[in-house]
Design a protein with these regions (language model features):
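RNase H-like nuclease fold core
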Residues: 1-59
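Glutamate identity and glutamate-enriched acidic tracts
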Residues: 4, 24, 30-31, 44-47, ...
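Short amphipathic alpha-helical face segments that pack within enzyme cores
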Residues: 59, 63-67
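RNase H catalytic domain
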Residues: 66, 70-152
Length: 157
């Protein structure tokens, strides 16, 4: 079971970077076990839903958050709270609401959560919900997972 998911998005000197660390739940007093850890450079801009998104601090962070949520759902069938490196963004992730000026940047994150909500609305059994959602992120060419891996060139498994 996943206990924590930390993300970091940075934009320094014209270079965007993302990092994600996901840890496993362990008994109190034991050292946390890292389940997954990845970092990557971000292109200057990218496309999602016909919108051009330019790399900046927030956009790097939302990209990391989207990846983290996707990985947790795909590999552990578990939604998680995301701990961000900025308190403003942290509030947005917890509420899952974003200011209007950031809607285009956050659309991939929002789309993924909407797909999960739709699966929950259609099925009562949590195992079925998880399976429906995981199948969605594995097979649809236009989904967020493939967009992250292919369009953003984040070649992780």
């Amino acid at each position: 079971m996943i206990t924590e998911c930390y993300i970091k998005g940075r934009f320094d000197y014209g270079v965007g970077k993302c990092a994600v660390v996901i840890t496993e739940d362990v008994p109190k007093g034991e050292e946390k076990k890292v389940l997954h850890q990845v970092a990557w450079r971000v292109p200057e801009s990218w496309e999602y839903n016909g919108e051009t998104i330019v790399a900046d601090q927030f956009n790097c962070e939302i990209l990391a958050a989207t990846y983290a949520l996707q990985w947790c759902m795909k590999n552990h069938k578990q939604l998680v709270n995301i701990y961000a490196n900025t308190t403003t963004c942290q509030k947005w992730y917890l509420r899952r609401e974003f200011p209007e000026s950031r809607k285009a940047s956050a659309q991939a994150y929002i789309d993924m959560l909407e797909a999960y909500k739709k699966a929950m609305d259609e099925h009562d059994d949590t195992e079925v919900v998880d399976r429906v959602f995981v199948e969605y992120i594995k097979k649809d060419d236009k989904n967020v997972w493939n967009w992250l891996v292919n369009d953003i060139a984040l070649n992780v498994k």
